[in-house]
């Protein structure tokens, strides 16, 4: 099978994304970095961020070498795994790490330049920050599609399988590089989350509550570590998370498409089904770039106007992609192109609804957060209670939206043939529709990730302006940019969680295809079904596999798997919350020590030891991230070896359902506490320094690990467990107790 000409649109779009990202980076570097003091502060943050990243990558490299050797043994020693897996695993991790490095480098160079641009105008500051954030967005989608293109070309050339099984083998092999991306994302999210919140909690508790000094005050020893943490967690961490979702959704959908049309007379349609998600992602890149250029605002713009400025770019790109999808699938000539286009639209709309719901429950422009701020009048306890309650209620809309998106995407893909909804062919097409809905949701990632990466850049710009002593007009502009960044960051977290849920569901369906390959690898060509009939493994449907492995709710191994999966979300959150607590204790003690021992800090005559706080956060994050991160790799392997395929299916379902709901709750509760504090700081309920303010600072401090460590890391937990299960499918088939 030759590679069709239309495929080359995919690597071409990847190259365009990287070229535009490079142009934005060069444009940002040409901006003036400001006064000597602004440059000095930016250099402190830059050195701290890069020191952390170097240390993290050293640890991750050791883990990758060990896992790659293990996969090499399974492939070449035990013979239970595809021989390409070790190499695919390494490239997935490499490209994910590369995206994080470029994003972090850009963000740390952009903050002072954004603050300096804000000295000219609000619009100038917005453009510098947003286009610097766009570097992260475009690098993620560019490197993601480049990696996918590379592996498709290599495997198409070297996989020596004929007939419809060739594309099945190619797509299931490509899917395994997602584990490399997932593993790298796991360490980036968990380590970055622990780092940033240890610094943030330490800076807030001692600086704001005990010493009574403002946020980002240069007298606070933890303030540089806090600024470094914004980049570590919200740029490198978020980028790795969404890189994993982006690649995972495209690859899982391609694998489902290859399986749905794996018949001798359907090979042409099979190729179209594999190419469709790649082409939608490729066109999405180009249209996202157009949206990025549309973002601008006027001087003195209100928060609603600033949000509208970003919304113009995102919504315009979404509308263009929605229209382009119909054209792509029609010209491709794929079966039921109209229904599949509607599945893509379903994903796009679901992403927008989840983003809007997140904004409603976390922005102080709306009642839920206003009520939390009002509850501060009776102390910190009521702030905590109100935030927990609001976070729990906020799960309803995202869960119902994802549920509606799943059923609509499924029905659109099968042409609303509800009478035969569970027929084998319709089930394959329906699952393909769900996968392509996930691709639709992530097709705007080039610009949606730009709005998210913009947040920490604007936050650091505000910190730089505060520490550099810039005038009140500049601080007013950077505060406006920072407030916008807080809202986009919260919305971005909701988007990341929703996309993770749809991607994990597509990966769950793809797991069955890996089981098929695992059976064939182990020389099993026939399934003896419980009803007394037999079916060739190559031709078996998903329903045949469900019956063969007895994946029903009456099977105790499935139930055990569901309980373990549900428990994993809470166990993981507990471990990461405690990790932040321990690291924050070290930071609090260090800041107190410096206030006590270094004379003149609070009067501005002494200089804090910023480097010591950066070092404490770095060491704490590296030490604390190992166990939670490795847990997500070890548990799926152990469940597979003990309870087999049925147990793993239960594990993935339990982890997906509990992880999704818990992630929404934690992200929204944390975001609401943060913005309730900001509302009080704007002068409501007594303003800064009041008892209400101190109560909201406590709420914000509790919410920090909720929204920036445990909550976002659950996205990767549910995807990584799926990816590990997929990669280890051959071992699970060959060796299990039950």
Task: Tell what function each PLM region has.
Residues 1-738:
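Hydrophobic packing and interface segments
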